[in-house]
């Protein structure tokens, strides 16, 4: 970890003001944390992170508390600053807009990696998980196929019981 530089009070206030301005949050400078909405808190945390001008930023569900406009602002901010971001996202509709590359993780293992359109296509998901429409799928496969709106020929909103090992993703 690089050493953080110590700032005097004036430099600290200036850095905070600049970070809030970059994130479009200048109006929040004098408010307490308790008075901020969830989305404002989320954006303030991101502003705090980017004011250190990192080369890499790891974001865990960065858009959870953001409305659609604020999500767009966040994507624009990250793109404008040119920071490399590793983002943990479960909102599959956001992934295509946010990511240049996608790693699909299943049970802690890398299941697929590539460009969003390629990884999130129905054919790639079926190939990756060797989805057989005549067997009961693993619950992860069901959730993924539903989230990606991939048409399937069987009902999936029923309890799934499974015997045997989980399918091994192809490489």
Predicted segment positions?
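Conserved ABC ATPase "signature" region
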Residues: 10-28
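Catalytic Walker B motif of ABC-type/P-loop ATPase nucleotide-binding domains
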Residues: 57-61
